[in-house]
């Protein structure tokens, strides 16, 4: 498994990131833990989570057998208010059993107005970073327009954005603009990784082709793929192995 440095954060991450947005897999069963640990044995050290995913139990169990510094863990908050974000961060730390998160993100920010409305939360996250509770601040977005604007926001160090070979689920722009935005983010030192490369299953019948498309983008550090079983993990790992960087 190839690795990349996640922009100016300096975090060394695997090109494949395990997306954990399946509460039935990562919430209560041992399967989620097994996926994370098997992925780690295959070189996957990057785990994407959120307060809304219900995946903290699997992360906590997996961390019991790993050194915390060997994995990069993200989480997110939908909250538009500081008290809600504080609660979500405290919950993430408590339920994963760790003292810090590598990246904590404003979740699903899809317009500039929404981003401006979350400035208070951004200020809180910057304070939390200063306290060592998080190591980097990020934003997840479906919007190409917002992704482009984030290149000029110094507080934002990591961007998780929607991109897939059919341009599905992109708001505020199109595939071409999203590519331009991600390249600019990459070039100014932001960490860049992708979500919804299979468009929440709509490209499932072309999964390997869709994964190759994502892994070949040279200005993307990692690709988050929702993994529901060990077979899907194996497929994603194998595609990453043979995907040539264009």
Regions found by a protein language model. Give the residues of each.
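Beta/alpha (TIM)-barrel catalytic core signal, keyed to glycine-rich beta->alpha loops juxtaposed to Asp/Glu
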Residues: 109-246
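Short, acidic/polar
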Residues: 25-39, 82-97, 142-149, 205-213
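CE4/NodB-like, metal-dependent polysaccharide N-deacetylase domain
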Residues: 86-105, 127-131
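Acidic (Asp/Glu)-rich catalytic clusters
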Residues: 7-10, 41, 59-70, 90-99, ...
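N-terminal binding-site loop/beta-alpha segment at the start of enzyme catalytic domains
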Residues: 1-70, 213
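Acidic-and-aromatic substrate-binding clefts and catalytic sites of carbohydrate-active enzymes
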Residues: 24-29, 48-57, 78-85, 112-116, ...
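Conserved, mostly hydrophobic/aromatic
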Residues: 6, 18, 47, 59, ...
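Short, well-ordered coil/turn segments that N-cap beta-strands
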Residues: 11-16, 43-46, 67-71, 98-102, ...
């Amino acid at each position: 498994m190839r690795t990349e440095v996640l922009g100016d954060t300096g975090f060394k991450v695997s090109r494949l990131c395990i997306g954990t947005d399946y509460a039935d897999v990562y919430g209560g069963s041992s399967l989620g833990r097994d996926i994370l640990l098997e992925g780690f044995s295959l070189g996957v050290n990057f785990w994407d989570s959120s307060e809304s995913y219900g995946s903290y139990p699997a992360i906590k169990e997996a961390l019991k057998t790993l050194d915390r510094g060997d994995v990069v863990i993200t989480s997110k908050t939908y909250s538009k208010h500081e008290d809600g974000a504080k609660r979500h961060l405290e919950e993430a730390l408590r339920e994963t059993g760790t003292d810090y998160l590598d990246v904590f993100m404003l979740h699903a920010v899809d317009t500039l107005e929404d981003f401006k409305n979350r400035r208070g939360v951004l200020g809180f996250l910057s304070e939390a970073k200063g306290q060592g509770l998080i190591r980097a601040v990020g934003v997840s977005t479906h919007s190409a327009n917002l992704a482009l604007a984030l290149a000029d926001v110094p507080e934002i160090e990591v961007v998780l954005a929607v991109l897939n070979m059919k341009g599905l689920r992109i708001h505020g722009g199109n595939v071409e603009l999203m590519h331009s935005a991600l390249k600019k983010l990459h070039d100014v030192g932001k960490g860049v990784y992708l979500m919804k490369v299979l468009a929440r299953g709509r490209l499932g019948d072309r999964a390997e082709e869709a994964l190759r498309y994502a892994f070949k983008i040279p200005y993307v550090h990692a690709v988050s793929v929702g993994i529901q079983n060990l077979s899907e993990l194996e497929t994603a790992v194998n595609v990453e192995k043979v995907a040539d960087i264009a």
